[in-house]
Amino acid sequence: MNQKHNVTAEKLGIQLSTGTLAGLAGGAVTVAMGETTVFVSATAASTLRPGQDFFPLTVDYREKFTAAGRFPGGYFKREGKPSEKEILTSRLCDRPLRPLFPKGFLNEVQVIGYLLSTDQINEADVLMVNGASAALMISDIPWNGPIGCVRLGEINGEFVVNPTNEQMYDSSLDLIYVGSEKEMMMIEGSADQIPEARFVEALEFAHQVIQEIISAQCELAELCGREKKEFELVKTPDQVLDLCREITGNRMEEAIFAPSKQERQVAVDAVKEEASKACEEKFGEDFDPDHISMAFEIIQEEVYRENILIRGKRADGRAPADLREITCETGVLPRVHGSAVFTRGETQSLVLSTLGTSRDVQDLDGLTGGPAAKSFILHYNFPPFSVGEAGRFGFSSRREIGHGALAERSVLPILPPEDEFPYAIRIVSEIMASNGSTSMASVCGGSLALMDAGVPISQHVAGISTGLVTEMNDQGEIAKHVVLTDIIGAEDHFGDMDFKVCGTRDGVTGFQLDLKIQGLPFDIAKEAVKQVTEARMKILDKMDEALPSHRKELREHAPRIESVQIDPEKIGALIGPGGKNIRRITEVTGANIDIDEDNSGKVRIYATDTEAMNRALQEIELVTGEIEVGKIYRGIVRGVKEFGAFVECLPGKEGLFLVDTLQLSLIHI
């Protein structure tokens, strides 16, 4: 039986243990913080799939209902497809792990995490990342870790490490930081327009904090780590690579500097086809088409990087810090509540905003705690035609969910408080064309669509992505680098970094960093933040030219929401016996009425147009009002007796008029 080992990062309150569960996995670790516990395993396939030309890493995180002492909903009473949160946590874990596997290691690797228990106080995503790193460290899988992960908040100007769910309500920062011993590996999160200088301070602070969990993983690996296996590393045969270089010559450089993305791809494919025929003739039965694809990846990367590092020349002719041409249009569609088209180079997003009522909010059934619902949603759709292809369509991919979440948390900080603007808001970004940074186009288009809908945001939010091209020395350190602003798809693919930063003129609202190299030095990170801030201001200038402030009125077809305060003692009168009065008002006006359950007397009215809203307000005033002496009312005679008439002056309020008080010349009974 395996021996149990425990290590603890005391300041962080995180405990790592192994030796109890999953003894046959490559590596298995249980991570706990408070009473929240996550199990993570890491296992690699022993053989390579035939024709494998990419690294098949799969990271899956699942939350078990048993962790919260609950039954799954639905007929089958079993966990189903992964939730949005599970997908986002899986992606969060995948991104910092991937760059640390050896180049050429293409065996399938599975990292699987389960939420085993939750105290609904401590979040599990940070535990998943630390557990995955620890599982790989003690496994037989080659991996250049460890990494440490921490969540950082800021409350009243002070950084808070791994804040609880309750503390996050008061935090102006939600930073998830992942780093190695010396450098950062991945960041993501949001902030309430935090200044760039403070943002960098948060990164440096978080890097110091993770050192304890990194040391704990190293200690665990020393106690029980398995010997690393020798796996076959896939490499392009030198003779194939040399022949392809000989055939392409300078033609590859000519191909990648074609005017458009499609022309570049056509030119590269033509050169590739010629090289493929030459290799087939030379190598005969030993010819492998996969080797051609791998060789051309290497050659294209060399040409892209050489031109940027030596000549400062990018594929589309821009200098490293240049933006592509930007155009902004608003109000592009009828009837919708808000619409905008944001175009940057060959990237284009059609963004639509819709206003709804409190009945349209999205309920959140988070097992680990947090908000019960959210009234702002941003959905991102990436159809295959946006890259000129035919492909899978109809279901949201993990990538679409991840990009939508990034854009959503970047726009959220600029929205007005719900007590000032009590609408549910949904933004949908339809990507019409893609050549890099579509998620950032969604942020810019989303801001324009909000203003076009009349949502009272004080200023625009914009986003842009920076890339990086590096040259390493013999010690594996960065000897030369160039930071690129507004990267296109090829620069993302062949480059070393994708660093997205969103914000207003006042500060940062959202961010995400992904790397292909094994760490980003802080001096380069600071350079990238400075460069992306300058670019963001230029984008905001363009957006302000298109629509400098929000529309003063909501669109004609947008719902109307009003709040009125009534005497709490009149709530019963408004509802009526068995809900009679409130049903009548709804039927007569077409408006929906919600009464706060706290007996405060706050009433919300939801109507499809202004006329229905005014009628509903009038009806509520009549029902909850008092009959005033000396005021003339137009009433309805509800009953007539010999001694007088019963008259309804206000809804539900009748009075008796005696015959001897009526001064009428003629009364018909």
Q: Could you describe each region identified by the protein language model?
A:
Residues 1-45, 232-371, 559-573, 581, ...:
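Extended amphipathic alpha-helical scaffolds
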Residues 1-232, 287:
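Long, basic N-terminal domains or extensions that often function
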Residues 26-110, 115-122, 181, 188, ...:
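Glycine-rich, flexible beta-strand/loop modules in the N-terminal catalytic cores of phosphate-handling
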Residues 27-29, 122-140, 330-353, 435-455, ...:
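Conserved phosphate/anionic-ligand binding catalytic regions in large, soluble enzymes, centered on
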Residues 140-256, 450-552:
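Mobile "lid/hinge" segments at catalytic clefts and subdomain interfaces of large enzymes
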Residues 231-238, 538-565, 610, 614-634:
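Long, charged amphipathic helices and adjacent flexible linkers at domain junctions
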Residues 643-646:
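Short aromatic-glycine-enriched beta-strand elements
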Residues 667-669:
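Conserved small/polar residues in nucleotide/adenosyl-binding loops
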